[in-house]
């Protein structure tokens, strides 16, 4: 990875795997015409890269990286952990997030992982390591993009437990939580149970 940027990056997300490969060359021409010099790739490609638990296939991502590198387009490499693959949710349902209404989400959309699931953490770490091993020395990769934008909060027991641990570590006592969060404003402090 480069120690610093050569110039101001100008670009956005690029998902060429959603289009026929014949379009990629035209994309590069349009990038140059528009002055685009960087692009974020691989944001939601986990299912494509890891089609099953112990199988990884970087063929298409290699082609995308090679195309962008050949055209000297700077790459922001995402870890692909913004959306779970179906096999993972089927085999390990606890990796999917639970929303504020208690609904357990499935695969097929973004922000669908429980960040405190040990299974999610294990596979996300393994994928990030494999990406770093494979692409870490590529001079056109200028930074790494982890997960995606904020969203997809999880309210499962793993997350509730982790939140309580965080509160205790940060504030030490419930009185300090109430003070810091101004919980006495609406007549009563947070309950102690």
Model-derived regions: residue spans:
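An active-site-proximal structural segment forming one wall of the substrate-binding cleft
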Residues: 64-71, 111-144, 170-178
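Acidic, His- and aromatic-enriched active-site or binding-groove loops in soluble protein domains
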Residues: 100-103, 166-174
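Aromatic-lined substrate-binding rim segments of carbohydrate-active enzymes
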Residues: 28, 42-99
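A cross-family glycoside hydrolase active-site/sugar-binding cleft signature
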Residues: 11-15, 40-42, 76-80, 145-147
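The substrate-binding groove and active-site-proximal loops of carbohydrate-active enzymes
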Residues: 10-18, 45-59, 106-123, 150
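N-terminal carbohydrate-binding accessory modules
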Residues: 1-38
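Short, well-ordered coil/turn segments that N-cap beta-strands
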Residues: 6-8, 35-37, 71-75, 137-142
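Conserved small/polar residues in nucleotide/adenosyl-binding loops
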Residues: 186-193
């Amino acid at each position: 990875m480069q120690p610093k940027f050569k110039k101001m990056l100008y670009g956005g997300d690029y998902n060429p795997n959603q289009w026929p490969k014949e379009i990629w060359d035209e994309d590069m021409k349009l990038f140059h015409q528009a002055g685009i010099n960087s692009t974020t790739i691989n944001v939601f490609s986990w299912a494509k890269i890891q089609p099953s638990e112990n199988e990884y296939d970087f063929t298409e991502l290699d082609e995308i990286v090679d195309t962008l590198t050949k055209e000297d387009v700077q790459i922001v490499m995402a870890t692909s952990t913004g959306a779970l693959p179906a096999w993972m949710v089927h085999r390990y349902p606890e990796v999917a997030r639970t929303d504020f209404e208690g609904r357990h989400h499935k695969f097929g959309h973004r922000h669908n992982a429980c960040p405190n699931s040990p299974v999610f953490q294990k596979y996300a770490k393994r994928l990030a390591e494999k990406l770093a091993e494979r692409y870490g020395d590529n001079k056109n990769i200028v930074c790494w993009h982890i997960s995606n934008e904020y969203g997809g909060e999880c309210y499962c027991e793993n997350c509730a437990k982790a939140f309580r641990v965080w509160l205790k570590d940060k504030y030490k006592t419930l009185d300090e939580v109430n003070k810091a969060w101004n919980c006495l404003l609406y007549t009563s402090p947070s309950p102690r149970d």
